[in-house]
Amino acid sequence: MTGLSVAFAFKTGLFNIGAAGQYTLGAYGALYCAIMLKMPWYVCLIVATILGGIWGAIPGFFKAYFNINEVITSIMFNWIGLYLVNELIYQNGTGPMYDVRNTRTLNLGKSAELSKALIPDFGLNKMFQTNSTTIAIFLAAAVAVLIWVILNKTTFGYELKAVGLNKSAARYAGINEKKNIILSMAIAGALAGFGAGLFYLSNVSQWNPLNSTSLPAMGFNGISVALLASSNPIGTIFSAIFISHISVGGSFLSTKYYPTEISDLISGIIIYLCAFSMLFRGKI
C-alpha cells in the first residue's frame, strides 16, 4: 500500500517521500480504535485511512499555498509523526495501549474483546498454516484496481494528472490546482495509512515504541515498489509481492555465509536497472 501511495503521488506530479510518517499515523489510528475504543476492524481501517490522509494533506497544503517542496515537509513530518506516536503509546511506560511485559502495544489476538478488531481470515490461516494471513491482501489489490480506475477512467483522475503535468495549463483550463495538489497528497497519505491498518489489524506485529526510533521500512520500500512498477497502480500489486519476497527471504538467510543486508543490495540493484531501462527507453 505504501508503494501504491508513492505511485499515486508520482502519477499526479508529486513525490510522496512521507509515506513512512503517514503509515505511522495510520498504525496509531488503527491500534487506538482497536485497543481503546474496541471498535470492529473495518472502523479501525477507516480511522487509519483518515489519519494517514490528514498527515499527507499537510505537506500538500504547504506545497499548494506556499510552494514549499513536498519532499522537505514530508521528511520533517515523518519524524514528527514517529516520535508523536511513540510518545502517545508509551507515555513513560504507563500508556493504556502499552504492554509493559512485552514492551509493545497490546496483542489483539490475546483477548476475545480485542480480537474483533482483527481482519478476518476466512480460512486463509489454515490454508497457509500461518496466524496472520487475512483478506488484507485482497483488500489491498482491490484498492489498487480502484486507484487505476480513478486515474485512468474518471474526470477527477484526469484533473489530478493534469495539475501534475503542468499547473499553469491546468489553471487556464479552469482546474483548481491548489485543491488538487492537497487532494493528491491526502489520497496518497490515506493509502499509506490504510496499509498500516491492514498490517497491524492482521496481527502480524505489535508496535514497539522503544525500538521504533527509525522510520518503518515499509514507507521507503514503497518507493522501490512504485519505481519497479513504473507508478502503475496495477503493477504495484506484483512489484510489492516481489520486493516483499526479497525482503522476507533475506531474513531467513544463513548469517554464517551471507549478511541479511544482501536482500537490500538486491533490491537496490533492481531499482537501478529499472532506472536505466527508463533512460534507454527515453533515448530510443
Predicted segments, located by residue:
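Interfacial loop-to-helix junctions that mark the boundaries of transmembrane helices
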Residues: 18, 41, 122-136, 254-264
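Single transmembrane alpha-helix segments in multi-pass membrane proteins
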Residues: 1-36, 49, 53-57, 61-68, ...
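Transmembrane helix-bundle core of multi-pass membrane transporters
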Residues: 78-153
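Transmembrane alpha-helical segments in multi-pass inner-membrane proteins
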Residues: 191-193, 202-268
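Alpha-helical transmembrane segments of multi-pass membrane proteins, especially transporters
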Residues: 19-27, 44-52, 70, 74-78, ...
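Helix-loop-helix "hairpin" substructures at the membrane interface of multi-pass membrane proteins
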Residues: 2-6, 54, 121, 128-206, ...
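Cytosolic-side transmembrane-helix boundaries in multi-pass membrane proteins
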Residues: 165, 172-179, 250-284
